[in-house]
Swiss-Prot record:
It comes from Mus musculus. Belongs to the complex I subunit 6 family. This is NADH-ubiquinone oxidoreductase chain 6. It is a multi-pass membrane protein. Core subunit of respiratory chain NADH dehydrogenase (Complex I) which is composed of 45 different subunits. Coiled coil: none annotated.
């Protein structure tokens, strides 16, 4: 299981590299979609089925809208690719090589570990007398509204501000 999450983390970083080294806006949106999808798989790998599904539906649904919008606004007859400029391709390959080197070093020194989340016991197990029941659907809702409240507020306001930034940029 750790190797699965480790490979997904590496793919997430490669997607972020693709986002940072985008030669055209089309590939930036594609990098965000790939990174978001891999992030959802990581959440599912840790057992957060509801939260992974919510992120997949809401975040990637919104990203597909933004991806379609940027594609429509920045359509080029011959868009640049990662291979059309040797400098961009070199940085992308260098980033992937550095990521593989980091994976090898971490595996050699056995530094890969799972994060210990101590405060999760309050809402994971529902105990009555000596019997404990875990409700899977409610775990995601509890996580979203108890531990991740400020992240949701910041994400909502960021999306709200992003709409106005996009409107201001595309205004004639």
């Amino acid at each position: 299981m750790n190797n699965y999450i480790f490979v997904l983390s590496s793919l997430f970083l490669v997607g972020c590299l693709g986002l940072a080294l985008k030669p055209s806006p089309i590939y930036g949106g594609l990098g965000l979609i790939v990174s978001g999808f891999v992030g959802c798989l990581m959440v599912l790998g840790f057992g957060g089925s509801f939260l992974g599904l919510m992120v997949f539906l809401i975040y990637l649904g919104g990203m597909l809208v933004v991806f379609g919008y940027t594609t429509a606004m920045a359509t080029e007859e011959y868009p640049e690719t990662w291979g059309s400029n040797w400098l961009i391709l070199g940085f992308l390959v260098l980033g992937v090589i550095m990521e593989v080197f980091l994976i090898c070093v971490l595996n050699y020194y056995d530094e890969v570990g799972v994060i210990n989340l101590d405060g999760l016991g309050d809402w994971l197990m529902y105990e009555v007398d000596d019997v404990g029941v875990m409700l899977e659907g409610g775990i995601g809702v509890a996580a979203m509204y108890s531990c991740a409240t400020w992240m949701m507020v910041v994400a909502g306001w960021s999306l709200f501000a992003g709409i106005f930034i996009i409107i201001e940029i595309t205004r004639d």
